[in-house]
Amino acid sequence: KRVLHSYEKVISPVSLPPRGEAEGDSKLVGPIYGIFMDYKMEFRRKDRIIIVYGTGNEREEDNRTYEDFAQKVKEHLEDAAVIKGDEDVSMEEKVSKNLVLIGTPQTNRVFREISTALPIKIGDETIQVANRIYKGKGIGIVMVAPNPFNKELFVLIYSAFEPSVLRNIFSVYHGGTDYIVFSKESLSEGSEPDPNKPSLEEGYFLKNPNKWEPFPSK
């Protein structure tokens, strides 16, 4: 495994396919912005979206940051999505809803329940993409993948180890890929995302009907 400290850019030696080329029979196709574009399709309409923010921060101020960010996500979706704290989500909702999870496995219990089943592993200030490991408090990730509770539905992850970084995730230029790992340096100084700001890594997953996997580096 390659350990990469935050702020080190990965240049992947593999050639990533465009959207849809490696999907097989997978119903979900990504990328991140695809969730915002096609969630109103028939199979999405019958399974509404629930936005779940973590409540496990030590500081109540950080929990409020998560809740405020959940409202931002709802506004982007332009949908009557339900917003709930992680302690208030039922198993029925986890199985029947598309999930948007905000926080980390340490601060969001729903996130923690599915963390080992996600194609990218998020630990304590670490993010592992295939055989690449990023470390640092000032890093984060946006990712779309099948919902481990119901693989016909999606889970959209907004995660950062510093609440101040999470608060500004929408200033990171993202959407055209299935995932993006970023650092504080990826945040735009203005109100709009800056495509010239570097990410640590972004890419697509190898998509099979029941499993999505990131491309390993050689």
Feature locations, PLM:
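Solvent-exposed alpha-helical segments and adjacent loops
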Residues: K1-K218
